[in-house]
Structure formats: C-alpha cells, structure tokens
Curated annotation (Swiss-Prot):
Domain of life: Bacteria
Gene: mutM
Organism: Halalkalibacterium halodurans (strain ATCC BAA-125 / DSM 18197 / FERM 7344 / JCM 9153 / C-125)
PANTHER family: FORMAMIDOPYRIMIDINE-DNA GLYCOSYLASE
Keyword list, A-Z: DNA damage, DNA repair, DNA-binding, Glycosidase, Hydrolase, Lyase, Metal-binding, Multifunctional enzyme, Zinc, Zinc-finger
Cofactors that this protein relies on: Zn(2+)
NCBIfam families in the record: fpg (TIGR00577), PRK01103.1 (NF002211)
Listed name of the protein: Formamidopyrimidine-DNA glycosylase
List of residues binding DNA: H93, R112
A GO term for molecular function: damaged DNA binding
Entry EC number(s): 3.2.2.23, 4.2.99.18
C-alpha cells in the first residue's frame, strides 16, 4: 500500500500535470469505488465543469481541490493515476476517467479495485470520515517528540502496532515503520508505553529522516507503485530491513528476521534492535 512518501510523490507529480484543467466528463466503470455521494451519477454531475485548482495530501489520502469540491482519493493497495490523450487506448483495470477539455484525461487504474473516492463540499472534507479522526502529520509543526511520547504512553499496544495507528500519526505503513524502528534501534514488539522518553526522541527524528529521504527519492517501488508520471521510486534501494528477511544486517551482519506483529509482517534485526 502506498504510504506517505509515495502519496506525496504522486501529489507532486500529478500537480505538474493536472492543475488548471477543467473536467468535462467523468466515466466510472466500478461504482463501488465511489463512496460519497452514494449516487454515482450525482458524483459525475457534481464534477462536471469543475477545475482542479491544487493538489493536497492528508496522511495516505490524495486530495484534489476543485472550484467547489474536494475529491479525497485513497489508492489502497495498487491504485495509480496517469494522464493520457483521449485517443489513447484504455488499459484494463481503468475504473475512473476524468475527461478534460484539452484533449487529455486523468485515468485511475486499480487491479484489485480497493481504491476509494469521496467527494465533499470544499472545507467539509476535514470534518467527516475518512479524514476527520486522522492523527498528526509527520511534517507538521505539531509533530514533536513530546507529542509522540504522550500518545505512545497512553497505549498498551506494541510499538509497531501503535505507529501504524493512523489516529496517532498519519502516513506510516509497514515499510516506514520497520525502517524507522531500525534506525531508532527499537524492537517492534516492545510495548509502546515502555519506550523511554530518550528513545522516543530518537524515534521521532528517525521517522522524520526516513520519510524525508523517501520523499526525496520518490518513494519505494516494492511491487507496482509508480508516481503520477509513471516513474518508479528509488528508496527501495536503501531499505535496511523491510523485505530483507534472511539477508545480513548492514550494521552488524546478523540475518534480518521477519515476524508478525498485530497481523502485519514485520522485519527487524534481533541484535541491533532492543
């Protein structure tokens, strides 16, 4: 599933392609993706004539800011956007097409059909699900070591599970939680409330450093991820633990271990992380 670095990269690359374009028509081939409004025909009607003014992101959600509405899109496992000429053939698994007035169209493709779209009156999107109860943004001024300490101290869950909770901090998934915990030398199965203040301070910086580096490298292309211009990310080449089960730790030479924490595959070094 695309995490913060991947969604942020999609936001940036799509912004270069679609800002200023006006939607003339919307075609929906898989109605179950449209979660709001309930009526797909209304979804299409409301978007007609709307111009994309800016692109935003909230956690793992992509936001299209239009004249009067905000389209909130979640890519889920394998969703992707791409800009095409209208006369180009439509690929299999293309489920939503936003047809513009300049001969181009934005296509949403999703092999597994897990992606979702919600349309809100501008300004309402932050007040209602799926955005209303999301936690702090890692790159915001509100995300401090003190805040992270307070939130982790209030949960009895393991640190890996706590960091995956989008109500605590948004944008982190399996990849970047594993990587940040490795950099902070914290074992993923430790209880969050038992992590010391000093350790949380290191973890806070590890989260920021990991996400910043990943964004700068366009995210991680583990499976099918590409950005809005069809380009792969490069951060997968720097992964220390994620996806490296059995390979040697770059710090100590111990084979990387994979276990399951909270139902999620988890990679770590049994020597470096305590």
């Amino acid at each position: 599933m695309p995490e913060l670095p991947e969604v942020e990269t999609v936001r940036r690359t799509l912004a270069e392609l679609v800002i200023g374009k006006t939607i003339e028509q919307v075609d929906v081939g898989w109605a179950k993706m449209i979660k709001r409004p309930d009526d797909v025909d209304q979804f299409k009607w409301l978007l007609k004539g709307q111009t994309i003014r800016s692109m935003g992101r909230r956690g793992k959600f992509l936001l299209f800011h239009l004249d009067d509405y905000t389209l909130v899109s979640h890519l889920r496992m394998e969703g992707r956007y791409g800009l095409y000429q209208q006369n180009e053939s439509v690929a299999k698994h293309t489920h939503v097409r936003f047809v513009f007035g300049d001969g181009t169209e934005l296509r949403y493709q999703d092999v597994r059909k897990f992606g979702t779209m919600h349309l809100f009156q501008s300004g309402r999107e932050q007040m209602e699900p799926p955005l209303a109860k999301l936690g702090v943004e890692p790159f915001s001024d509100q995300f401090s070591a003190k805040l992270l300490t307070e939130r982790l101290s209030k949960t009895s869950r393991k640190i890996k599970s706590a960091l995956l909770d989008q109500g605590i901090i948004v944008g982190l998934g399996n990849i970047y939680v594993d990587e940040a915990l490795f950099r902070a030398r914290i074992h993923p199965e430790r209880l969050a409330k038992d992590v010391t203040v000093a350790e949380v301070k290191i973890l806070h910086q590890a989260i920021l450093n990991t996400l910043t580096e990943a964004v700068n490298l366009g995210g991680s292309s583990i499976k099918s991820y590409v950005n809005g211009q069809g380009e792969m990310g490069m951060f997968q080449q720097r992964l220390d633990v994620y996806g490296r089960k059995g390979e040697t730790c770059r710090q100590c030479g111990t084979p990387i271990t994979k276990t399951v924490v909270g139902g999620r595959g988890t990679h770590f070094c049994s020597v470096c992380q305590k």
